[in-house]
Amino acid sequence: MGSYHYTSTSHFFFAGGGEGEYSSYKGTGSTDTHRPTTVRIPVTTPGPERPPDDAAAARIQAAFRGHLVRRHAAAVRGADDEATRLERLLRRQETVDAVRGDERERARFSEALMAVLLRLDAVPGYYPAVREARRAVTRRVVGLQEVFDAVLAAPDAADTCGVPASLDQVLEGIWGESPAAPPPPPPPPPPAAVEVEEEVVRSPCWRRFFGGV
């Protein structure tokens, strides 16, 4: 079968009054009964949302900062424990005698104090809490060094009748405080009083009074 072309020549005509069933198809002359209404829609600008990558990075950084603070606080706490141990040693009379009589003991104790200071210097002070704790422990160790130097600078044994100076005497020289000293012994009686007492004891009346023969 061959192809063919179809052309329509139909025309539609409506009533001239513009009224009727098909009056809405006219381009002009129709009355619009539905007027468009304007509705206001509020438009809000949403806040900038943080991308998932940025939120994850912030959480990782916060966790890492917390880890650093805990590690630095543990280092300061360890240095404080070492300072407490050295302070207890320095309060013992055996330690005082050892550091004053032996050069090696003196160097060993001094190196222990310097090692504590080096441990504190290795702790960074980025965070305020860690910085304040490190400063307090550093002051404590410096005070121990001053006491240690005062122990070494105490008077020799010859000034104390052959007995080394105690830590109480050293602290008395530093702070001007001393424990309550025992009262001095009473002076011996004069020779004349001793002779009179011996004569009284040798007399027969007193011997009879005390039950002697």
Curated annotation (Swiss-Prot):
Pfam families under this entry? Answer: BAG (PF02179), IQ (PF00612)
Record domain BAG: where: 75-152
- Give the GO terms filed under biological process for this record: protein folding
Q: Can you provide one Gene Ontology molecular function annotated for this UniProt record?
A: protein-folding chaperone binding
Supply the induction statement.
Answer: Induced by salt, sodium carbonate and heat stress. Induced by abscisic acid (ABA).
Ordered alphabetically, the record's keywords are: Chaperone, Mitochondrion, Stress response
Q: Cellular location of this protein?
A: Mitochondrion
IQ domain location is: 53-82
UniProt note: phenotype after gene disruption: Mutant plants display enhanced saline-alkaline stress tolerance.
User: InterPro entries of this UniProt entry?
Assistant: BAG5/6/7/8, BAG_dom_sf, BAG_domain, IQ_motif_EF-hand-BS
Main localization category: mitochondrion
Domain of life, per UniProt, equals: Eukaryota
Function recorded in the entry: Co-chaperone that regulates stress responses. Acts as a negative regulator of saline-alkaline stress tolerance. May participate in stress response through regulating the homeostasis of iron, manganese and zinc ions.
State how it assembles: Interacts with CAM1-1 under normal conditions. Dissociation of the interaction when calcium-CAM1-1 binding increases under saline-alkaline stress.
Name the chain's protein. Answer: BAG family molecular chaperone regulator 6, mitochondrial
